[in-house]
Amino acid sequence: MLMITSFANPRVAQAFVDYMATQGVILTIQQHNQSDIWLADESQAERVRVELARFIENPGDPRYLAASWQSGQTNSGLRYRRFPFLATLRERAGPVTWIVMLACVVVYIAMSLIGDQTVMVWLAWPFDPVLKFEVWRYFTHIFMHFSLMHILFNLLWWWYLGGAVEKRLGSGKLIVITVISALLSGYVQQKFSGPWFGGLSGVVYALMGYVWLRGERDPQSGIYLQRGLIIFALLWIVASWFDWFGMSMANGAHIAGLIVGLAMAFVDTLNARKRT
């Protein structure tokens, strides 16, 4: 038997299995931390991978729902936990995703209790030449948020995008994207506004760029971002640049992060194509 892929959502896994059954290919699901899909007849592996790439590009296509009805398997027989929302939060995020989220929450609470300035003195980008060897400052600015909406918006995107990268490509890949984008987006932002800035948005934009381009160029990676969302991200950058909403935003970090993410995805998919 050959393992084809894994899905965090068992219903999505069942939809793909049902569709392949209508195509004459029998797949089985084994439940572990995720729903692992296995193929008994390995001679059909290439065909399954082609169909999987199409499925990942548009899992909501009506033909997949129709396949579930046709196969008579609209009830997958899977048992779901009583708290599906909490289960989804846990299953979609790996340890790095959770650690960064926890760090952001802890820092936000500290800023609320003892004041923004006190925390920024310890975590902000080096604001004095004598601080340039305090290496953590080049990265810890991503943990600081200045309003509830600011942190909620960033953590939601971080969980959605960072969790997908970590689950599909590994914790190491998420760490590399986070470290590089935090450093470069922070460098650009301090050139625009000085050292007094914070937020995870530079990393979030890097993840947006990475996930979108990686999904476009390498569908078998299992990660993708709908084109409408990347268009929204670009429009948000334009709106922020011209201050249409009257909010102070780290425009330099957003643009730099997006470029970093696109560049990393291009390099990764270039290497993947060379290997194939």
UniProtKB/Swiss-Prot annotation:
Domain of life: Bacteria
Classification via Pfam families: Rhomboid, Rhomboid_N
Protein's cellular compartments: Cell inner membrane
Keyword presence, Transmembrane helix: yes
GO CC terms: plasma membrane
Residues forming the catalytic site: 201 (nucleophile), 254
Reaction catalyzed: Cleaves type-1 transmembrane domains using a catalytic dyad composed of serine and histidine that are contributed by different transmembrane domains
Molecular function GO labels: serine-type endopeptidase activity
Coiled-coil positions: none
Membrane-crossing residue ranges in chain numbering: 94-114, 142-162, 169-189, 192-212, 229-249, 250-270
Cross-referenced NCBIfam families: PRK10907.1, rhombo_GlpG
Protein family according to the UniProt entry: Belongs to the peptidase S54 family.
Name of protein: Rhomboid protease GlpG
Organism expressing this protein natively: Salmonella paratyphi A (strain AKU_12601)
